[in-house]
Amino acid sequence: MSNAWQDVSQVYGGCSFFAAWGEATGSGGMLVGRNLDYAGLEQLAGFQSINFYKPETGYRFVTVNYPSMVGIMHGMNEKGIVIAKAYSTVVPEETTVDGVPFTIMLRHALQYGGSVDEVVNIIKNTPRTVGLNILVADAARREAVVLEVSAYRMTVRREDSARANFIYSANRFLTPYLKEYQEPGWLSSAFREARFEKLKQAFSSELKVEDAVRILRDKEVEDPDSPALLPSIQNNATISSMVFDPVRLELWVSAPGGLLTTDQVFTGISASEVWRTGQPPSPVGFIPATETTPVVRAWQQVMTAAGASDQRKKELLTPVVERYPAAGYPLYLLGVACLRTGELQAGLGYLEQCVISANLPDPYYLLAAHAWLGVAYDTLGRREQALQHYRAGLAVELWEEVDPMVLQICQ
């Protein structure tokens, strides 16, 4: 069950990944960055390990994994193939438990796939279970694609241009074919995709491992004096981060421990040296921890608060919004926490501040704040104010299909 519970329960996490190659890396190499966003595994995150496999058949491979798991969610083999997955929720008709658990499928693909085409064929011919975005990168061909799959459908997404050298994914399908079968849900995919687009331009040439780590650590802090302090490529569910260099057969991994470890030291390891010598790995280098500036410290505090109790949210977020009164996401979290604990006036104040004057780049939170304000004003018998917020919520232009509950409240 350790390798099938995600398929059976259909409990979805987040995750982001990207691959860059050719001119994007300056040296003509290839780098793959991957954030594992899965707060449900946080208790296991402290037991994170780097596992090297030398199977009797197939290719040797390496993965970052957790106790009892023999399948993989990401990894690299000796042929320079890298695989990483991200959930992409699909309608119930496109899922089944009558298939191979996806972690076992991905292990099989990594163990026996020596090229993009071979991996694609393995996944195509494997009975699948759930919706996924699967990155497949091939160092030999300097090529990377994203497989968008459900239990019964599959398509291969490539970059549009023949000169393209950067591809990414979050938790939604981008091809028209699979979009038709997407289950509405909100995991900030569009926002993270927008961040990848911006960072792709910022690191348009000579991308190095250090730069790949900076992308994985992205917090959307464009203006340190007026930050939004909201989840980005790194977020409150990120429990592990890694960069694969399949040309050199190296991987760089964040420290074990779970939440916020992406900001800790990354350790570089040569898989080729382990496979050559059969000896335990020695670090080939380190990437320093994120500099803890005031805005980084505030962002980390907000991410910690996001998964905390309402009382703890209030303790953590009150000083943050005092220092950054235009930071929309902590205002939203604090306002909701106050409403839930019976502090209606305080909650209304924070949420009104959130919708009127806050920096809130992801429009979903604006919709949600209006919905909460409508419910709160209805609770107080102030129907006209409630209706104003319901209407304002319905007028928000969303970037992606969201969980219908918040929209239904406004409707």
List PLM regions with ranges.
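Fold-independent oxyanion-binding glycine-rich loops
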Residues: R34-L36, Y66-P67, A86-Y87, A139, ...
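C-terminus-biased signal that marks the final domain/tail of proteins
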Residues: M1-G14, L110, G114-A144, Y152-M154, ...
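A contiguous strand-loop segment
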Residues: M1-P101, T129-N133
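Alpha-helical linker/edge segments of TPR/alpha-solenoid repeat scaffolds
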Residues: G374-Q385, C410-Q411
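Second-shell loop/turn segments in exported
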Residues: T95, M105-A109
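Boundary/linker segments of alpha-helical solenoid repeat arrays
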Residues: A327-P330, I356-L367, A395-I409
